[in-house]
């Protein structure tokens, strides 16, 4: 699913959104506390999102310090593959990962995907925390750096191939705000660097803007939406922007994320720069993420 957006309009929209975050976050002094002469405290915002992924995109949430988060992500084939493939259920790709919270602000993670036999790792650091009271901060912000290594054989083994050609890097700033107990929104400006591209018409550095949102439906369920807009003239014809919709279901120590997406890959270099599915043609995957946390320290 692609939408045509003028770059200047995009910049203006970003400025307006950030300004809206700041405007809605101005804290009012508590008259009662002032009368009593009590010191005002800082109240930090928690659970902007339920887990550290919206669907594909990382969220501003971190795995807590000393907690190990085991994730299993499953992506079936396209729904339009027909009854012979049981609408995609006969095809599947999987990613198994482990995230760990080193501190309350710093987390790391590793994973392996069956799609293109890719290994990935990341580091995420929380820069700002949304808060009100004595110290006011309108948003939560994090920095994410990832790397991925594709291990499938080179398509042309007769030429000189380099190990560095298998490498991909992603740098992302996550800016999120919890507007109420029910509504959270996040923006994710991103650059994906690819050491090797297939054609000269493709850019090694791919710039994009991800946007995600969460609508809490009940105490344990929520509706999530996610869209990644890739700026024009960076990818070869046929690639599309990633769009996903899903539901989070919390059951004790597990969180199930059920979703539909036109992206096959479950890591940044793939769903941002390599999505080919067209929602209008039924090129949509059903998939799920399962998260189970363990306190190890």
Task: Describe each region flagged by the PLM.
Residues 196-197, 201:
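Extended, charged alpha-helical interaction scaffolds
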Residues 10-17:
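Sec-dependent signal peptide hydrophobic core
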């Amino acid at each position: 699913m692609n939408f045509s957006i003028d770059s200047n309009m995009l910049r203006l929209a970003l400025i307006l959104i950030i300004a809206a975050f700041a405007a809605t976050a101005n804290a009012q002094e508590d008259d009662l506390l002032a009368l009593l002469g009590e010191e005002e405290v800082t109240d930090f915002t928690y659970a902007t999102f339920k887990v550290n992924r919206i669907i594909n995109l990382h969220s501003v949430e971190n795995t807590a310090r000393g907690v190990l988060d085991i994730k299993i992500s499953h992506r079936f084939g396209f729904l339009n593959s027909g009854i012979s493939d049981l609408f995609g259920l006969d095809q599947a790709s999987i990613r198994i990962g482990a995230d760990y919270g080193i501190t309350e602000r710093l987390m790391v993670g590793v994973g392996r995907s069956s799609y293109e036999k890719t290994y990935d790792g990341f580091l995420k650091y929380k820069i700002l925390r949304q808060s009100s009271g004595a110290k006011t901060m309108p948003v939560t912000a994090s920095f994410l750096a990832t790397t991925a290594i594709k291990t499938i054989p080179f398509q042309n083994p007769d030429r000189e191939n380099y190990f560095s050609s298998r490498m991909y890097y992603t740098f992302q700033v996550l800016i999120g705000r919890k507007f109420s107990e029910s509504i959270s929104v996040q923006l994710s400006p991103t650059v994906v660097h690819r050491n090797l591209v297939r054609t000269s018409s493709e850019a090694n550095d791919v710039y994009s803007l991800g946007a995600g949102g969460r609508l809490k439906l009940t105490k344990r369920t929520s509706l999530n939406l996610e869209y990644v807009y890739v700026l024009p003239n960076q990818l070869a014809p046929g690639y599309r922007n990633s769009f996903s919709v899903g539901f989070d279901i919390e059951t004790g120590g597990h969180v199930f994320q059920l979703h539909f997406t036109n992206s096959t890959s479950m890591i940044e270099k793939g769903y941002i720069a390599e999505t080919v599915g067209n929602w209008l043609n039924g090129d949509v995957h059903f998939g799920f993420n399962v998260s189970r946390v363990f306190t190890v320290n």
